[in-house]
């Protein structure tokens, strides 16, 4: 995300004012929703975003290790290593993490969507979900390119195994599904095992 875009987002974030017996207190909307144990993962997944999401997960665990956390995802994907950092934290902490796709969950976005607690992975009906294999470009000496290519293959293998674990599909089925950009409707994603339910309204 460019600095200009971040600045625009910061200026557009609404503030919420709450009244209490101690007076008024203003929160930005995301901080207020964090009090309700809602974390937003919006935009490309990079190291900065991963750091923020991870910190919020750990904070909410420290607040109440038994209470569910809700992760709302609207992301085109991003860095595999950053996504794996969020994934590992989701699996590490004690609270269940419920995931909800709003808009899109592509690439590492879909990976994190599937990583929610089984039975608590959701999508809104008009969202778009996309899976594919990791990609990378290299420059340099042939030996270095070979090293990086082998690392990408190792990451691909690991991601396939994790998708298999969370979807219930065989690794071979996952490989086939991820061979190219594979766009899914929420209903198709449910059939594949990426999510558990398509939700239209709060029940």
Curated annotation (Swiss-Prot):
It catalyses: Hydrolysis of proteins to small peptides in the presence of ATP and magnesium. alpha-casein is the usual test substrate. In the absence of ATP, only oligopeptides shorter than five residues are hydrolyzed (such as succinyl-Leu-Tyr-|-NHMec, and Leu-Tyr-Leu-|-Tyr-Trp, in which cleavage of the -Tyr-|-Leu- and -Tyr-|-Trp bonds also occurs). The keyword Disulfide bond does not apply. The keyword Hydrolase applies. GO terms for cellular component: cytoplasm; endopeptidase Clp complex. It is found in: Cytoplasm. It is an enzyme of class 3 (hydrolase). Its EC number is 3.4.21.92. It comes from the Bacteria. Keywords: Cytoplasm, Hydrolase, Protease, Serine protease. Pfam families: CLP_protease. PROSITE patterns: CLP_PROTEASE_HIS (PS00382), CLP_PROTEASE_SER (PS00381). One of its GO terms (molecular function) is serine-type endopeptidase activity. One of its GO terms (biological process) is protein quality control for misfolded or incompletely synthesized proteins. The active site is at 107 (nucleophile), 132. InterPro entries: ClpP, ClpP/crotonase-like_dom_sf, ClpP/TepA, ClpP_His_AS, ClpP_Ser_AS. Cleaves peptides in various proteins in a process that requires ATP hydrolysis. Has a chymotrypsin-like activity. Plays a major role in the degradation of misfolded proteins. Fourteen ClpP subunits assemble into 2 heptameric rings which stack back to back to give a disk-like structure with a central cavity, resembling the structure of eukaryotic proteasomes. NCBIfam families: clpP (TIGR00493), PRK00277.1 (NF001368), PRK12553.1 (NF009205). Belongs to the peptidase S14 family. PANTHER family: ATP-DEPENDENT CLP PROTEASE PROTEOLYTIC SUBUNIT (PTHR10381:SF70). This is ATP-dependent Clp protease proteolytic subunit. It comes from Pelagibacter ubique (strain HTCC1062). The lineage of its organism: Bacteria, Pseudomonadati, Pseudomonadota, Alphaproteobacteria, Candidatus Pelagibacterales.
């Amino acid at each position: 995300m460019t600095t200009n875009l971040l600045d625009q987002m910061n200026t557009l974030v609404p503030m919420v004012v709450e009244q209490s017996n101690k007076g008024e207190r203003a929160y930005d909307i995301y901080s207020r929703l964090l009090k309700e144990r809602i974390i937003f993962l919006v935009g490309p997944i990079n190291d900065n975003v991963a750091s923020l999401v991870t910190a919020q997960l750990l904070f909410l665990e420290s607040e109440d290790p038994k209470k569910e956390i809700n992760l709302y995802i609207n992301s085109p994907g991003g860095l595999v290593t950053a996504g794996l950092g969020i994934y590992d934290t989701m699996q590490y902490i004690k609270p269940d993490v419920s995931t909800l796709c709003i808009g899109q969950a592509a690439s590492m976005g879909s990976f994190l969507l599937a990583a929610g607690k089984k039975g608590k992975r959701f999508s809104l009906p008009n969202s778009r979900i996309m899976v594919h294999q990791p990609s990378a470009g290299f420059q340099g000496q042939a030996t270095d390119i070979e090293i990086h290519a082998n690392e990408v293959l190792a990451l691909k293998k690991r991601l396939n195994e994790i998708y298999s674990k969370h979807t219930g599909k065989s690794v071979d089925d996952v490989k086939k599904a991820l061979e190219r950009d594979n766009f899914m409707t929420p209903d198709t994603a449910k059939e594949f095992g990426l999510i558990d339910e398509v939700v239209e309204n709060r029940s």
